[in-house]
């Protein structure tokens, strides 16, 4: 980090020192102070800038704490970096090396930099710069103490960016009013630190917490900027507006989301009110500006040696006026992008010309006393041959960095089609085929949760982005930080990376996602792929290492906002891994990976490099925008299952597993099975037209992962397996060893195999539709299935069916448990439906693994797994009567069972995110109802004909269900990851488990003898009791109330139902011996008449006890008389 250029001139003055102060948030400020100033005076000098009282400051240089009574010159700190810490460090700290791209944050004391001359490496940023937009209400202690930080997320309507801009402006106006009040009422009480957003009439409908701070909690640059009138700031913002929109103007009217709660765009009258209030503030500020000019004009020579009070007053004025100017400038820049298209039909509303991402710079959002680390990525513009590069936003961004309003409203897309049909204002937009492609990635490197989603916005008839599956709770030990939420249409996290690509060259390779471009030459321009891959991977990977508060939503087509409450507490590192669409795919939880391989990475970068390719959505399609929120480096592993999942804009997808990608039109929902990709697919192996070669794809992913995981000790270019990666992080050596506690049973062993052979790059490739990792794993899979699946038998069709029946039948209890609490369609046997469906799917997968030997092994296997997942979802949705909420309840119930022992808030967040993504998946389901009707089984239907061997196996399975349950059911204390590894089997049936219980109950003899409402309760008790150890003879209530020591001695006591055992125990207790031999006594006691007498006596004793026991209630035990009546 380098000081501002303006400081170089003052460095020559021998009587002054240039000191760089680095704070805990990794920001560096440059101060020019007198060489004779002592440490105490220096602390007072910088106190207002760093928002830390001088008495709490600790300055550290070369490992030593600077003493207050010594002079700075004695420590030789000129031009050096001093580290500043508080006496009690804040709860959430940013690693010191995490922010490498930040520049000097403050101007010099002698003179600020001239306006507009800010280089890329010297961007100005401070904590209050963008602390105004945030979704959810934060419940934070005011005293700075923190345990878990909870986000209270309510149902937030979709917000619009113009509304966000006005809200930001109003909050900054409030801050300016506070500063003016402090200047007008000298020595008055300090203004409030933050205003509850709910009190703002503008945001009353939305529960959007907009944290506003005064300069007290702001890192205001003590060496203030040069005086600059608000009008100048406005002019600068206006002058720079055209140059700051490399990505093109935004539409006058954003496309409304499918939900009813459309964005609430503000009217021009509201804009006028805000401008009038700004005008009033400027008039109030004028007298202080005059004094500000006078003080600064004489600052170079004024002698304050005998006028300490005057110096403090002037310094206070400089700080407050400078802060007011900064807020005023931010306000003007935030408002300067608002436009009103007069060509639209009334009522007209405001829209924005460019998103805030073009202004954003790293900062720290701080509310109450807990700083929340936020980084907003810089804007990177890529240009191609033959195109005019747009101006770089970094070099021209106004100093206030208004984009610090880290929110990009529902139209966080940079380009969107105008619904009114009027041309959007601003710079003339390029032709439809050359609209910029924008990639936004929000990443948090230490959060224990992962949220990733993507939306490629296309024409109105196109389905929205297929949601990704949230992953299990992950996070490095020691981080209990705020986690993110997804509120579609109102992303609260600042965008990490914005790569704007204007007017891409026509020679770029084609990709299946963009509009067709005449003359596109697939394969052309590949010579620059190597350097481009290096640039993209290095850029994204480096920027992803910056922590960011996550809350990014998909624009337009996002699912309805149903944010969850989430909290992350420090704890052990849980390591959840999902093997992606691996051979065990059908047994994986359906929602997590329903759309794996939906979108190839070529489409992601294709959007960046330019539109081209057959099968595009047509000329009416607008520029796709991809939004990815990615918190958590460890979570990145499991987050791979969610990465880049969006709908294909072309007809059934180009990737090898066509089934997952939802077709663009309803009539295509009955798309042919994956084996026959549509006409768009031209490359061998069933792959669709790829705009980028596999080598380029792999190099980019490898580069990103290397940069991303570098902090976790991953070697550059390493192909470390997932198992090795997790074992290295956790310090355990048996996480993925077959037979270990965390990986029992067939599916656990299969997961172990995949994790030991797949690297994270392989998983990313699989999720983008590249089957090469599966192709490479063919020998190991075949050997594994032969040993663990067939038990060494020959892979004949009969043996495969028998093994499949044995395996899937063991899942019956899980299917029954999953559907025990939902309403199934009348007459549907949900258990049989799921079991037989799984048998058929897994049978085809196993047969393919055992018999396929050609080069199409991997592509077909990936296709089968994805097809099975989508059909499983469609089938269970049909069995549940089309009730998406019921299906979500089944899946979330399974998640909760697998996540016992995990932080409940994380589980709640996970289930809510799953519901959001499931809804979008189901809305664009590529499998039609006709395709799954053949799997539906009705109550009373004859059983499906099976070979004789499976029937025998079924009998043996039913007689000994315990081993299967033991292998497939996660213990209550398992981690989410272990549960995930074992949970997949039940989850696929997860679509309709409650119905299974209901249907099964009707076939059980006891079900008819109890009220219907008791059936699910009893079934649940039965399931839970089967999983616990046998209880001692005494009642649970009696034992639970007994002292532990006595309970231990009482184990096994109680009445014996067998007379021989009762007599034998009584004889031993009394020390008596039978007159005859023990065998003779046993034979006598087993005589029928003796047994009957004993039975009658036992019944009589119990009846007497029931009659005399005052605690016995016949109403509570209505069936007791059946067991102990006179007549058996």
Swiss-Prot record:
- Which residues form the sequence repeats? 236-265, 410-438, 569-596, 602-630
**Cellular component GO terms, alphabetical:** BAT3 complex; cytosol; extracellular region; nucleus
- Which SMART domains does this entry report, sorted A to Z? UBQ
Where N-acetylmethionine occurs, residue numbers?
1
Q: Which portions of the chain have biased composition (kind: Gly residues)?
A: 678-688
Q: Which SUPFAM superfamilies match?
A: Ubiquitin-like
Marked site, Cleavage, at 997-998
* Low complexity biased stretches: 95-108, 238-247, 403-412, 564-581, 999-1016, 1062-1072
PTM sites of type Phosphoserine: 96, 960, 969, 1077, 1113
Q: Where is the Ubiquitin-like domain?
A: 17-92
Give the start-end ranges of region Required for interaction with GET4.
Answer: 1006-1036
Instruction: Please report, in chain numbering, the residue ranges of the motif Nuclear localization site.
Output: 1008-1050
Identify the keywords attached in UniProt to this record, alphabetized. Acetylation, Apoptosis, Chaperone, Chromatin regulator, Cytoplasm, Differentiation, Immunity, Nucleus, Phosphoprotein, Repeat, Secreted, Spermatogenesis, Transport
Q: Name one GO biological process term.
A: brain development
Name the segments for region: BAG-similar domain, required and sufficient for interaction with UBL4A. 1054-1111
Spell out the Polar residues composition-biased ranges. Answer: 189-201
Write out the PTM section of this UniProt entry.
Answer: Ricin can induce a cleavage by the caspase CASP3. The released C-terminal peptide induces apoptosis.
Q: Which region ranges are annotated with the description Sufficient for the delivery of client proteins to the endoplasmic reticulum?
A: 1018-1128
Summary of subunit composition and partner proteins: Component of the BAG6/BAT3 complex, also named BAT3 complex, at least composed of BAG6, UBL4A and GET4/TRC35. Interacts with GET4; the interaction is direct and localizes BAG6 in the cytosol. Interacts with UBL4A; the interaction is direct and required for UBL4A protein stability. Interacts with AIFM1. Interacts with HSPA2. Interacts with CTCFL. Interacts with p300/EP300. Interacts (via ubiquitin-like domain) with RNF126; required for BAG6-dependent ubiquitination of proteins mislocalized to the cytosol.
Annotated function: ATP-independent molecular chaperone preventing the aggregation of misfolded and hydrophobic patches-containing proteins. Functions as part of a cytosolic protein quality control complex, the BAG6/BAT3 complex, which maintains these client proteins in a soluble state and participates in their proper delivery to the endoplasmic reticulum or alternatively can promote their sorting to the proteasome where they undergo degradation. The BAG6/BAT3 complex is involved in the post-translational delivery of tail-anchored/type II transmembrane proteins to the endoplasmic reticulum membrane. Involved in DNA damage-induced apoptosis: following DNA damage, accumulates in the nucleus and forms a complex with p300/EP300, enhancing p300/EP300-mediated p53/TP53 acetylation leading to increase p53/TP53 transcriptional activity. When nuclear, may also act as a component of some chromatin regulator complex that regulates histone 3 'Lys-4' dimethylation (H3K4me2).
> Domain text from the record?
The ubiquitin-like domain mediates interaction with the E3 ubiquitin-protein ligase RNF126 which is responsible for the BAG6-dependent ubiquitination of client proteins. SGTA also binds this domain and competes with RNF126 to antagonize client protein ubiquitination and degradation. The ubiquitin-like domain also mediates the interaction with USP13.
Identification of the protein by name: Large proline-rich protein BAG6
